[in-house]
Amino acid sequence: MAKVEKKKFTKEYRLKEIQRNLTKKARLKKEYLKVLKDEGYSIPEKPQYEKHDRSSVEAKKALNKQKVRDQREEHKLRKRTQKEKEQSFKEQEMKRIQLSKEKQVERDRRAKKLTQRTKRGQPVMGPKINDLLDKINSDETYTR
């Protein structure tokens, strides 16, 4: 008494199920309309489908094609602007890196001058005084 298991995941089974459901719905609708007629109610008319003329269909297709073209153009424009932004960002980053390297070289040069020592180990005061004078000259509070 073992049941034969149906293979629910096969294409044939699904097609049979769809066909079975369609015939069941058609039979139920027919019975419903027959009962309505027997009880004296008016039977609803079948909906009339509008026939579309070719010009309106072609116009819709043309409109859709135009929309697709517009979307593609917009996408290309967005990509182009994004690439330009990335390029400008890279250029700014390179400038910033170059500027920081130049500042670091200047700091190293200045530090080397300020840490100079005589033969006996005493600090050389000339570069320190010159550095302080340069700072005063470059500061805008002391210049008029």
From Swiss-Prot:
| Alphabetically ordered keywords of this record | Coiled coil, Nucleus, rRNA processing
Compartmental location: Nucleus, Nucleolus
GO BP, sorted A to Z: rRNA processing
Domain of life assignment? Eukaryota
Compositionally biased spans, kind Basic residues:
110-120
> Does the record bear Translocase in its keywords?
no
User: What cellular-component terms does GO give this entry?
Assistant: nucleolus
Pfam families given in the database record: rRNA_processing
Coiled coil, from the record: 64-104
Return the annotated region ranges for Disordered: 42-144
UniProt lists compositionally biased (Basic and acidic residues) regions at 47-76, 83-109, 131-144
Q: Give the family, as the similarity comment puts it.
A: Belongs to the FYV7 family.
The entry's function note states: Involved in the processing of the 20S pre-rRNA.
From the Swiss-Prot or TrEMBL record, give the protein name.
Answer: rRNA-processing protein FYV7
